[in-house]
């Protein structure tokens, strides 16, 4: 493998050893390359571990892959994780220091809505009022309440501060009642991972000190996306004495304010708490001159240095309707495929092209045109979680959840609904009550899974053998049977991905890893035009990009327009545009 060549400034940063470091790295400046090179250097010189934190599982995998390409042994000295993955590991490793008996199950947003609605209907002061709302008003109420609950957790408001900070007594009571309901199910949500890990660390100095001594160096990528809870977890790990922390980020790429993220935690809090040495990376190795010239109009930043030797193309087009826009974009895609462009080796394929929008609904007209033209395309996904389509796979997954968490009556009820039974108090009773032979076998096999999942392969094999031997009349079509087969094969791949990443297997940990998107199987490059929102595509790149739906109210978003040009919301829209362009 050829040695990566760094610029003199990149090399200087990659060679730094002790002390706090802040790297302000503009788009396309090679920050991941610098980060990996520094981690590689640190891992080779420490007997302990380097902690590398990033914000997506894909970024984690990219760092692991780059390190393994140099030397697989380096991975023994590096722990790469997202903040949520790190916090899940901290909680699971020290569950005895929490209020939980066993590692709780991570509930998704749909689960949270069901629990919150149950909480509201069981609260006398809210129940009658809630029942008087129409369906739309109920949905809006649930979303607002869940947002407020998340805000409390992301703001790291502990119980002794609740009454001081949250003046609305009804909201306080709803928050506490919701938590009690979740506790009764031995469940947590994604925000709980951060809050509970933070509480565990600050209330147990010995545990915090254990991590402080374990991780000699800490590196955080995409630090402009930090929210308060994540920053406080970082502070709880490092304490006041651990200063070997490196943050890498770009204020101009901060686009997650709706999740409580803010570049102030990188630019202000980190600077005040750690007094880092600050470096700037402004050279762009990704985008052509025309692209950067356009980006500079958006963010008014004249520090970006162009390094690529070609000009590139950046054009604006205006259309009267979304249909006309979609027709012209697809026509443009057709005319580009098979041609050669400056700075790109070979002829353009559909896979070299991406169509981006502020919101997914904007891409609907593009999808219609691609379909009618019989052109290949796919939607970019985040990779978080795993949703099954077939009844059999859904039943197996729900049964696996209940098998790992017998307190979970929510998913027990969902399982009963799917397999057509009722009034069961346990997984065993569900198995006994199912009349459909194949579903009965599926749920029974899930109920027999070992705590460590050691029989997962054999269990899935048994289900697939039953599927092959089953009467075709049990399925509506051959396609339905094939869909079931594919989903169980996919589940097997997810288990394989999980098993490769850990030394001690756990069925509960596997299910949580799936919820966190940590088991997503690296797929082969998908042929076709990529359709994506800007948020989902962040950190990725394409040779040709069409940015659509740039009308006022859509991009920029109407809520940002209401807030005004100087608002945080409007700055986020500008950052979104900058990310999309670069």
Where would I find each of the regions flagged by the language model?
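ATPase/helicase motor core of nucleic-acid motors
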Residues: 272, 312, 347-479
């Amino acid at each position: 493998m050829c040695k990566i060549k760094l610029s003199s400034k990149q090399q200087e940063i990659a060679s730094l050893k002790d002390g706090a470091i802040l790297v302000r790295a503009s788009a396309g400046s090679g920050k991941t390359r610098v980060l990996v090179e520094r981690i590689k250097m640190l891992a080779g010189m420490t007997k302990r571990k380097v902690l590398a934190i990033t914000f997506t599982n894909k970024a984690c995998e990219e760092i692991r892959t780059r390190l393994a390409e140099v030397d697989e042994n380096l991975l023994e000295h590096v722990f790469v994780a997202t903040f949520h993955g790190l916090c899940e590991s901290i909680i699971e490793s020290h569950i005895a220091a929490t209020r939980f008996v066993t590692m709780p199950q991570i509930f998704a947003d749909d689960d949270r809505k069901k629990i919150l609605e149950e909480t509201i209907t069981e609260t006398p002061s809210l129940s009658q009022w809630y029942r008087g709302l129409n369906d739309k008003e109920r949905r809006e109420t649930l979303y607002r309440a869940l947002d407020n609950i998340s805000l409390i957790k992301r703001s790291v408001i502990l119980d002794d501060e609740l009454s001081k900070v949250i003046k609305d007594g009804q909201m306080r009571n709803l928050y506490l009642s919701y938590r009690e309901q979740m506790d009764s199910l031995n469940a947590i949500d994604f925000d709980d991972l951060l809050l509970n890990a933070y509480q565990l660390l600050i209330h147990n100095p010995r545990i915090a000190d254990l991590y402080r001594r374990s991780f000699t160096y800490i590196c955080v990528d995409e630090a402009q996306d930090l929210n308060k809870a994540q920053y406080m977890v970082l502070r709880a790990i490092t304490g006041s004495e651990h200063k070997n922390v490196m943050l890498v980020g770009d204020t101009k790429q901060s686009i997650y304010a709706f999740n409580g993220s803010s570049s102030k935690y990188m630019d202000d809090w980190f600077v005040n708490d750690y007094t880092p040495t600050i470096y700037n990376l402004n050279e762009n190795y990704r985008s052509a001159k025309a692209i950067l010239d356009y980006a500079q109009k958006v963010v008014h930043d004249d520090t970006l240095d162009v390094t690529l030797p070609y000009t590139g193309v950046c054009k604006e087009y205006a259309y009267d309707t979304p249909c006309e826009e979609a027709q012209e974009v697809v026509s443009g895609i057709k005319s580009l495929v098979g041609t050669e462009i400056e700075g790109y080796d070979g002829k353009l394929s559909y896979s070299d092209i991406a169509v981006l929008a502020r919101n997914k609904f904007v891409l609907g007209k593009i999808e219609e045109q691609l379909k009618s033209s019989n052109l290949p395309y796919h939607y970019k996904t985040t990779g978080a979680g795993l949703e099954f389509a077939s009844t059999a796979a859904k039943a197996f997954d729900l049964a696996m959840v209940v098998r790992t968490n017998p307190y979970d009556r929510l998913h027990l009820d969902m399982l009963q609904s799917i397999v057509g039974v009722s009034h069961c108090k346990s997984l065993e009773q569900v198995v006994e009550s199912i009349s459909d032979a194949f579903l009965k076998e599926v749920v029974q096999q899930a109920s027999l899974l070992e705590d460590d999942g050691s029989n997962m392969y054999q269990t899935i094999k048994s289900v697939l053998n039953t599927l092959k031997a089953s009467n075709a009349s049990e399925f509506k079509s051959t396609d339905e049977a094939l869909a079931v087969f594919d989903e169980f094969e996919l589940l097997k791949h997810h288990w394989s991905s999980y098993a490769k990443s850990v030394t001690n297997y756990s069925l509960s940990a596997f299910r949580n890893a799936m919820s966190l998107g940590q088991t997503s199987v690296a797929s082969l490059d998908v042929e076709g035009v990529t359709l994506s929102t800007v948020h989902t595509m962040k950190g990725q790149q394409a040779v040709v990009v069409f940015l659509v739906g740039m009308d006022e109210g859509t991009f920029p978003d109407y809520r940002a327009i209401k807030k005004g040009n100087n608002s945080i919301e409007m700055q986020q829209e500008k950052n979104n545009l900058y990310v999309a362009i670069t």
